[in-house]
């Protein structure tokens, strides 16, 4: 091909750039409404005729295309009912691409879906066309058939002799069509791309884009030197419907020689996919008795092939229908939309409840010879309508019930209804239309059996009604279908017999109230409390008895019910509440079995003046001087008005001292004041009689005693302590006697204590006069002591070395002391016997003890060093070494004579002369 060749305009066939995104629809359980593609592309010529079809968009609403409408946002294009896009007028497209939006909307749900339509304008020339090239355009040739044609890339023209430069213009290369599923051999050449500059300089060619250097990789390749482009493997339109590549031309140094051009490669569809139903089983329903043409359901099948070609155009048909009753063609299907509708009348749920329809979908526009097919099952359920009125199984029913029974089922009414059980079309509703004007009965529906239960809701008396003839009508909860009339068997008669039973007697007036005055004597006839036996035809006798008579005041005649008093009726009794006394009586007949009824008699007791007033208070206190205070008195009466106040308070004339000492002042009808009449009354307790009289007819009087304590009072009128004692009934002499008794008792207690102390002193003295043979100090006592000092720290060792100082020791407090300690208390003095002292006796006694200790090998210190605990400073004992037992000086033992006769022997031992 040379640069001077003419431009041949190649007419491009209409094809859409489709994207493969169909999934395996057999695994989907739900349908998603919308366009099959989001973006549709088609190649068109620049001149478009009015009504010319450009492409077809495919839309699925999942319920059929019925009610789906299309519109565009361009006035130049419209969409038909089948999705075909066409021009509304003759157009000359000025640009290389036109885009607009197609909208599908459902008129029933008002939902909308959008898709974009792109129209590409192709402008090419061919050297074989015989036409001259147009100015301003480069020659670009594209021929996919071998031998491949050369495609010239645009390049800038040189400046002509007039100094003008042609303007460079980019071109849209016509798409390259590649059939899918090609068997090769591969690589298979598609086209050769060549620049018109390759005669001047060496050029290298390359391609980029999806399918070249982007996944999927290396689907297409190009010879860098010759510019021949190849496809390397079979294509699948369902994976990629189109490819967009860019071709590049550079010199050997990598410098761009030409601008990149766009290459569109479309995979030509082949019918290699069967239609697939969205669901393998479809469920629909239609009312029984529906007219022909009634919509039932929609089945939808999708084909992965190109929907704009016959490969993807699916048509539907019904293969079989089971059962074929009442006709083998009860339904039909719209071949394009998949809508199933009724085609014949006679749908009856009571005969056929469900149909199974096999639907076939075939592509190639339904051509069974060339198209691929698939099937699905449509289950059509015939829904119930109320076209069968309920009918009684019998024209009459009967039952019986004892009188006075309620909530008792008398009879069960059975009905038959051929509609669907336990649905509003089957559930029965019963209604009594005649025979029960008083409303004694109702008919309730058993929810399980649908039977009518005739129930007594209001007690029936055999003596008034012995039988009932009811008329009952039955209907359904749902109204009957149009054109269906009620059956004469929807009404039945019910005969109900009432059985007589022994009814209990009853008191016509219950509770019965009578009024009378209290205090009527026993045997008084009060009233006749009789009962009535409702069993008038049995001629039974009624007997009466008491059931409750708390105070046992009444008696009833067993045959006629006459009530008399058995005791005096007292309104003020504890058995009377609010002036009413209540008793209950029993009336029993002699039927088999006997029946009884109760009646209550209420007696309202009218008050009479039978209770005298009582004075209040019973005790009080008052000052011994009359001008300080007084006692307020009143009265209490068990009766009621007018048999109570105003009261009259007065003092009796006997004894005369009462009126002499006391006086009563009336305050009002209920109160008075009791005060002293004299100027002074000795303190004490006084019983003051007062006569109280009520205002009854006749009036009653009562003499009551009030105990009054008279006592001295302080300035505030309150009794003082002495006064309170005196007011308790003790005189001055009694008080003095009590005080003397208290003093005598205290004196006796003091004497007893002194005697006990003296007895204690004598006991200690006797212990000092015990014989030496009995002295426990001569006994050998073993103590678990290992040295140290005395445990008895209270013992005064100074008395051993300074006995003369004992006379100056102060008296010690009474308590426990040593038996060898001299008492320090006051003692009677005895005359001192003249004695010659024997100062050597004590020395001999000590020396003898020392000798015995030295000769005793068992006595301490065992020739060993003894360590004694330090007893602290201040000890009056001093050092043991201070004891001087070898002194021959005279010792004065005269102080022993001061110890009394009990120590006479000891004084004689140390106070006498020396004995040889």
Curated annotation (Swiss-Prot):
Cytoplasmic side: which ranges?
757-916
User: What broad class describes the main subcellular location of this protein?
Assistant: membrane
Q: Which residues cross the membrane?
A: 735-756
Q: How does this protein lie in the membrane?
A: Single-pass type I membrane protein
**Segments in the Extracellular topological domain:** 170-734
Q: Name one Pfam family in it.
A: Cadherin
Sugar attachment sites: 283, 412, 557, 632, 661, 702
User: What GO cellular component entries does it have?
Assistant: adherens junction; catenin complex; plasma membrane
**Could you tell me where the Basic residues compositional bias lies?**
129-138
Under Gene Ontology molecular function, one entry of this record is: calcium ion binding
* This protein's name: Cadherin-4
